[in-house]
Each structure stands twice: as C-alpha cells, then as structure tokens.
Amino acid sequence: MKTYLDLLEKVMTKGEVKKDRTNTGTISYFGTQSRYDLREGFPLLTTKKMAWKAICHELLWFLKGDTNIKYLVDHNVNIWNEWPYEAFKKSNDFKGESLQDFVEKIKTDNQFAQQYGKLGPVYGKQWRDFNGVDQIEWVINEIKTNPFSRRLIVSAWNPGEIKEMALPPCHSFFQFFVNEKYEISLQLYQRSGDLFLGVPFNIASYSLLLLMVAQVTGLKPAEFIHTIGDTHIYSNHLEQVKIQLQREPKKLPKVTLNPDIKNIFDFRFEDISLENYEHHDPIKGKVAV
C-alpha cells in the first residue's frame, strides 16, 4: 500500500508541529485524500501486521448498533477499553483496579459491564438510530431503489449527543457512489486521523463495509476514498513511522464474503475470509486517550 506510505511521508515532511487534546503532541497536516481500488486487492496494510480479527469485530459491533465494549472484550478485542476505564476511575466504585482488572470484570460481571462498559451514543447508535432513523437500513434500501442518488449518506456526527459520547466520532461521515457500470464506491470524511494507529484500521474497516454493502445490493465494489481533516502523527509514534517507511509493501490480500448473506445485519465473523495476507512484523504504539 504505497498510497498509505506516501501519506505518512507527506505528513512527516510537510506537516506542522501542533499541540493536541491528549497533550502528546503531533505533526499535523490538514486536508488529505487517498484512493484505494478494491479491484486491485483488499487494502489491508502489509508493512506491519494488522489486527484483522479486531477490524472485523468492531465493524460487526457498529452494525449491531452496540455501544458497550462487552461484545468486543468477549471476543478479545481491546481497542476501546481505555475510554470507559478512564470514566470508571472517576467513579466512587473505583478501588485502584488496573485496566486488566477492569476488562476482566467487564467479561465476567454483566451488571458491572452494563454500568461501566458504556461508551455513550457512539458510532453504532448513530448508524442504527440517529434521532430515530436507522441510517444503514435506509441507505441500503436507497442504493437498491435509487442507486444514482447523490444523497447516499450516513453520518455519525450528531451535535446534540456529542457531549454524551466517550469520544466524538473521528470517522464521522460517509457517502456511497454508484457509476453507470453499477460499481459502488465509498468515500469517508474523517475529521481526525491518527495516521500510525487508527487510519490503517479505518481503511480496512470501511473497505470491508463497502464489500458488504456491494454484496447485499448486488453491485460490484470499486474504490474506497479516504478524506481526512486533521491528519496527524503523534510524537510518540515517530520512530515507528520511520521503521514503517523503510519497509517494502507486499502484495495485497483478498477478502471474500459468504455469498449466502443477503442482509447486511446477518454477517458474522465466520462469514468473512482473509486470504493470502503477507505482512511484515507488527509495530506497536501507544494509543492517545
């Protein structure tokens, strides 16, 4: 995925040093766009090993309309744990538990999970119930009946509920486009992109969503277009980025879906198959909360 490496290089060389909410510090570049052609392979990063299982389960979690981390931790997906843990630490019930203790309690104590595993009305809530509108159901029906519409939009940005969210949506707005060949593309607008940790995850997640929507609407997947506002590299990821830029991308893998699935809400992890994924070693980095 040279396209992604070019984006890293651009931000490293043309970005500006900027303070941020987390007090970590970033190099930021405002306004970027990258295109990934799914006809040439699935855009899962090869210059470091990606957590494919986590990517799939998070997307399925969004599609369920779920906003509690219990489903994720039950499947050993730990990408959202820090935010509810930070909220738990401010509660009267906090007795010095570690993050690991917190996650174990989410797994084993349903009542605790219901109280402290909540993230507020984040992505799943907005996708499936934006002020009473199931946007995923609506957009799929619209694609089927009016594929050339310019209104094939789903928004996770709900100003009236932002303050109730553990984290306001970074990937906040996406739109589908169907051409005369009945090929479908998806463009995501992401207000804020953590280029080392988050963005590769987002590329794969929305590309997978595009494959799913294409299948259930009877269309052919074409491009994922990724538009990012504040495109940044955290200062504690700079060395990891330099390592990644030295690596040669490998051939892109292939993703196939169970062809029997005709309703997007019926997909399960077992219906998604990643094939021929060749990759370099993982590169770890700390998430900024």
Curated annotation (Swiss-Prot):
What is catalysed by this protein? dUMP + (6R)-5,10-methylene-5,6,7,8-tetrahydrofolate = 7,8-dihydrofolate + dTMP
Cite the GO molecular-function annotations of the record: thymidylate synthase activity
Q: What is its main location?
A: cytoplasm
Q: Which SUPFAM superfamilies match?
A: Thymidylate synthase/dCMP hydroxymethylase
Give the protein's function: Catalyzes the reductive methylation of 2'-deoxyuridine-5'-monophosphate (dUMP) to 2'-deoxythymidine-5'-monophosphate (dTMP) while utilizing 5,10-methylenetetrahydrofolate (mTHF) as the methyl donor and reductant in the reaction, yielding dihydrofolate (DHF) as a by-product. This enzymatic reaction provides an intracellular de novo source of dTMP, an essential precursor for DNA biosynthesis.
NCBIfam families recorded: PRK01827.1-2 (NF002496), PRK01827.1-3 (NF002497), thym_sym (TIGR03284)
The annotated subunit structure for this chain is: Homodimer.
Name listed for the protein in its UniProt record: Thymidylate synthase
UniProt source species? Mycoplasmoides gallisepticum (strain R(low / passage 15 / clone 2))
